[in-house]
Amino acid sequence: MAMPFEIEVLLPGELSPAETSALQKCEGKIITFSTLRHRASLVDIALSSYYINGAPPDTLSLLEAYRMRFAAVITRVIPGKLLAHAIGVGTPTPGLFIQNTSPVDLCNGDYICLLPPVFGSADSIRLDSVGLEIVFPLTIPQTLMREIIAKVVARAVERTAAGAQILPHEVLRGADVICYNGRRYELETNLQHRDGSDAAIRTLVLNLMFSINEGCLLLLALIPTLLVQGAHDGYVNLLIQTANCVRETGQLINIPPMPRIQDGHRRFPIYETISSWISTSSRLGDTLGTRAILRVCVFDGPSTVHPGDRTAVIQV
């Protein structure tokens, strides 16, 4: 009979009573493992396990690690060991709960993603007796995750441009701000490693070039139809008025008219272009962002989970 995948994290005997008590308060928080084993050590979940060539990770490095590593929820801390259940491996754990480690509220039904600390101080615990530190990922709603990822990648592009003297250092923007559920939050991203920034920018530029190419050809093919419908449809008329730059640029390009029949044998059939464009946008989100691993599922009690509170979840 299939069972939940339980992991035993062995705790060193050098831990002080205060550190053991602090670990017990971490029940419900999420940790990640580079490999799945039924028995692991405390070093496997410490911040040092994320180091790259001996250097501490930055925001993009942690984000990439969360995409590649296996997540698990701390279910119990007993003398000598820490018990955790892996997410997405084995049968779902009945009665699973997590602790909201983000500064934003979680609502019933929210899909939860893992993000690095981007709101200033990290949710972490220091174990000075063994020289280790554990940094817990943030439990962020998927809807908010998309906006945060966009701002982090945009900030990485800005830092890279400034470092390459493409953009003067004096014109760097201030801190990024997001609003969620009527509250204002300030993002503090840590971007130190060029590898993570370069990989994100390379992915962004490649997808951007492909999307612009497909989108311009699609728009040029649809302009005659939009011009005809603009006199009758207010939405289409507004769309045409807001696309003056693209239309003026398109007038400089002499592209032969495309046949109306879509038989799939030409390079840029309209509906195939639409499908390819949508698929590209989806892949870009999957490449830069992170997937949801849990969903808030509250049957009784308040539907809003405040920071630091615990809530029941189901695996997705």
Swiss-Prot record:
A single GO molecular function term of this UniProt record: structural molecule activity
Pfam annotation, one family: Herpes_V23
Keywords: Capsid protein, Host nucleus, Virion
Subcellular localization: Virion; Host nucleus
Mitochondrion found in the keyword field: no
A cellular-component GO term for this protein: host cell nucleus
InterPro entries: Herpes_capsid_2
Domain of life: Viruses
Main location: virion
Family: Belongs to the herpesviridae TRX2 protein family.
Assembly with partners or alone: Interacts with TRX1 and major capisd protein/MCP.
Function recorded in the entry: Structural component of the T=16 icosahedral capsid. The capsid is composed of pentamers and hexamers of major capsid protein/MCP, which are linked together by heterotrimers called triplexes. These triplexes are formed by a single molecule of triplex protein 1/TRX1 and two copies of triplex protein 2/TRX2. Additionally, TRX1 is required for efficient transport of TRX2 to the nucleus, which is the site of capsid assembly.
Protein name in UniProt: Triplex capsid protein 2
Organism: Varicella-zoster virus (strain Dumas) (HHV-3)
Lineage: Viruses, Duplodnaviria, Heunggongvirae, Peploviricota, Herviviricetes
